[in-house]
Amino acid sequence: MRTRAKNDKAILFERYWAMLAPAEFEPVSEYPFDKVIGRKHCFDVCFPQYRIGVEVDGGTWMKNGGRHNSEADMEKRNIAASLRWLVFHFTPQMLQRDPDGCVAMVLRAIRDSI
């Protein structure tokens, strides 16, 4: 199976995660969460054992509504919900402005799922 390269936004989340979260919760990049139904959608970062995904939306796509409002992205969100994944959406600006808060939100969800 071919793995997709990490994008800069995923790297940004992973950098803050490594600095602020316990090492026991290691994120996975570009995980194909819907492979079980024959699809190929991936989260930027996720924690598969807890069914928690992280999408870092933004950059050049955010202007004029952005790519993240497309039908394909809505389908991805709906598939994730139907498979009972909890998905967090952050922008790079949110991560830079409040990395502690973003990491704490995801960490709380992980701990609540244990």
Which positions does each model-derived feature cover?
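Nucleic-acid endo/exonuclease domains
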Residues: M1-I114
